[in-house]
Every structure is written in structure tokens, then in C-alpha cells.
Curated annotation (Swiss-Prot):
Subunit structure: Heterotetramer of two alpha chains and two beta chains.
Protein name listed in UniProt: Hemoglobin subunit beta-1
Biological processes per GO annotation: cellular oxidant detoxification; hemopoiesis; hydrogen peroxide catabolic process; oxygen transport; response to hypoxia
Domain of life: Eukaryota
Tissue: Red blood cells.
SUPFAM superfamilies: Globin-like
Encoding gene, per UniProt annotation: ba1
Length: 148
């Protein structure tokens, strides 16, 4: 089980409270598909992913980005039990979708980049980043649990 300090909880919940999941989710998934094009193989049914403009304008990418952020909200609401919260999701991504677990870290990094761009130094300082990346590392670990 992960131990969260009061400062970490405050930073994570404070950042989450400012995030617009309808904005950050689509941006982060689009960024992941553009920067790491091999991740596109999991989204063959999403239609045109042939260029950055096509990816950024793709409604299925945007919808799945919002779904991802909805999943993160579950982790936010269950910060003391993320592994159990994500148990079924880990099984699905491992056994049904066969997603390479390294991709979870790549997407988490893209979420971090998008949040940092949105809020800049004033809203995403080193202390916030440290707590946020710890939180996302816990989420990634929980998603990878079935792979071990």
C-alpha cells in the first residue's frame, strides 16, 4: 500500500480539481498517439490516424481520452486502494486487449506534459509534479499488476 503525505494528497487533489478531463484526456491521448506512433496499433478501429491533424480531430480518440480520465478519477477517489480499484482493468488490458504495459507509462507521461503545459510553473511546480508523478506511477503499477 502506498503512503500519501498530507502535502501529496493536497497537491494531487488540487491539480485534479483544476483539470478539465474533457480537454486534458483527448490532448494527452492524441499526444501519445503522435509522439509514440506504435501505440496506434491498439486503436485500429478508430479510423483515420494518418497525421497529427487527423488524430487530434478524431472523435473516437477524444472519447477514449475522456474515458481514460474517467478511469483516473476512480483512482483519485480510491487513492488508498488503487490496486484493487484497477484489478479488472488490469486483467482486461492484459488478457483481452494485450496492451504492452510500457504504454501506460507513456500515456501517463503525456498526461503530465499536458497538465504542465496547461498550468505552467504557477500551477504545476516541482512539488505538484512530484506528487502527481507518484500518483500516476501508482496507477501505472496497478494497471501492470496482471502482467507480473
Amino acid at each position: 500500500m502506498v503512503e500519501w503525505t498530507d502535502a501529496e494528497r493536497t497537491a494531487i487533489l488540487g491539480l485534479w480539481g483544476k483539470l478539465n478531463i474533457d480537454e486534458i484526456g483527448p490532448q494527452a491521448l492524441s499526444r501519445c498517439l503522435i509522439v509514440y506512433p506504435w501505440t496506434q496499433r491498439y486503436f485500429a478501429t478508430f479510423g483515420n490516424l494518418s497525421s497529427p491533424a487527423a488524430i487530434m480531430g478524431n472523435p473516437k480518440v477524444a472519447a477514449h481520452g475522456r474515458t481514460v480520465m474517467g478511469g483516473l478519477e476512480r483512482a483519485i477517489k480510491n487513492m488508498d486502494n488503487v490496486k484493487n480499484t484497477y484489478a479488472a482493468l488490469s486483467v482486461m488490458h492484459s488478457e483481452k486487449l494485450h496492451v504492452d504495459p510500457d504504454n501506460f507509462r507513456l500515456l501517463a507521461d503525456c498526461i503530465t506534459v499536458c497538465a504542465a503545459m496547461k498550468f505552467g510553473q504557477a500551477g504545476f511546480n516541482a512539488d505538484v509534479q512530484e506528487a502527481w508523478q507518484k500518483f500516476l506511477a501508482v496507477v501505472v503499477s496497478a494497471l501492470c499488476r496482471q502482467y507480473h
